[in-house]
């Protein structure tokens, strides 16, 4: 499942930890900008594009631009145009996906841990090292988020998703990278029509998992 050629590439391994830090910083700044505005009326990709066509800058547009910038930076060490495009899209789209998941206490974190732990074990050494600090901080934050004493917000959920996308892009081989991109892209498109929270609440086993640890 995991590509030996990608995992063992020393140039990618050395740069990956730096990429994690840069990606988190860029996405965090955009997410914080959106959180601090707190007056957004536009919803979804189409809503933000419509606002832009009307000459109004929204926090969502800033996040879209930041996701593109972070994706472009993350793609720099990728080998070949195809891989660069996959890295770019996975980072940008996964950042947005986790923002969509952050609609209930602990939900985005639970999904993140499903990816982080296997990726830290099987992914490139640089990615594992780069993620370790973030994962440690998130483990400490989880009880606080579950008890609703604090919330991730865009400044938290978006960077988490971006790092998941980065790790997937540099840990999976070609067929699985494309599969991951297809799934993430499809979920982003689906979110324009379907409420993930409604799906979770109407599915017994998802609802049970969603409520684990919550008061």
Model-derived regions, located:
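"…together with the soluble PPM/PP2C metallo-phosphatase catalytic core" -> "…together
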Residues: 1-194, 198
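Short, highly charged, low-complexity non-transmembrane loops/tails of multi-pass membrane proteins
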Residues: 199-215
């Amino acid at each position: 499942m995991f590509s030996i050629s990608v995992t063992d590439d020393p140039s990618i391994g050395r740069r990956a930890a730096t990429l994690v830090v840069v990606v988190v910083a860029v996405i965090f700044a955009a997410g914080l900008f959106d959180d601090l505005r707190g007056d957004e009326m536009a919803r979804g990709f189409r809503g933000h594009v419509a606002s832009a066509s009307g000459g109004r800058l929204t926090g969502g547009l800033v996040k879209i631009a930041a996701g593109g910038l972070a994706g472009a930076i993350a793609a720099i060490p990728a080998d070949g145009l195809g891989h660069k495009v996959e890295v770019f899209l996975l980072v940008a789209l996964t950042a947005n996906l986790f923002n969509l998941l952050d609609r209930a206490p602990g939900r985005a974190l639970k999904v993140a841990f499903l990816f982080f732990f296997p990726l830290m074990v099987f992914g490139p050494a640089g990615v594992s090292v780069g993620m370790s600090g973030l994962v440690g901080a998130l483990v400490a934050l989880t009880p606080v988020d579950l008890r609703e004493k604090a919330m991730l917000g865009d400044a938290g959920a978006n960077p988490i998703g971006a790092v998941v996308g980065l790790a997937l892009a540099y840990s999976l081989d070609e067929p699985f990278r494309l599969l991951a991109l297809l799934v993430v892209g499809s979920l982003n498109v689906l979110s324009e029509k379907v409420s993930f929270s409604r799906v979770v609440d109407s599915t017994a086993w998802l609802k049970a998992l969603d409520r684990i640890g919550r008061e």
